[in-house]
Amino acid sequence: MRNPPLIVAALVILAATLSAAGNQRIRSFNKAKRLVMQIAGDDGRTLYCNCRFSDKEVDHDSCGYVPRRDTRRARRIEIEHVVPAENFGRSFIEWREGHATCVNKEGKPFKGRRCAGKTNETYRLMEADLYNLFPEIGELNGDRSNYRFGHVQSTDMEYGECQFKIDERVVEPRSEIRGDIARIYFYMDATYPERGILGNKSRKLFEAWDKADPVDAAECERASKIEKLQGNANDFVKRPCLEAGLYIAD
């Protein structure tokens, strides 16, 4: 007779082994963006405001979203890095200092994201990791920038009914996705160590968010789809999903 706890434990160990390898299949951000839209499907929702979208156009009425300023960008869907690419990108020397091959047609050297993406495979794999990517309203993608997550004192709601607040370079998301964000940070920090992704202060905050907002069916389903496409698991999602009987595994 099978022992369910032992099966779950074995799957958890396997997931931890696979997640440690990180993304090894998706080697370009452009491909990753297409896959993110594929995962979202016909009933796609944005992360920060839970707005419906189709054909890369946002349905503001579905979530009560009101553009703060950039109405053109507010209508379109972009792909958001939850852990900002700039934040882990700065750990790569090619981002900070450039590379001998990072020279434009005029012979001028360049650095930053473009150079890291051109020359460093590890950076490309991190940039394209599906667990860290979500469809998002373009305006929010721009406004969030590379700001850290935390608690914001201001009570002003600048985006209509969307509970997304920014103040003094700190972003506070709606309570329903705080655990999701925490588990993404845990995964990225564990999978790609020594990239400065998670400090002690942020870790304590995300541990609280993880407890307050446990996994739900939607998060588990998305993680399962990503594992099939990318080949590795986010154990910080998969483990509690398995324990709750919410993970769809082949």
Model-predicted regions and their roles:
Residues I7-V8, N87:
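A generic alpha-helix propensity feature with a strong bias for hydrophobic helices
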Residues P67-D250:
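Domain-level detector of nuclease and nuclease-like folds
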Residues L11-A21:
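Hydrophobic h-region of N-terminal signal peptides that target proteins for export
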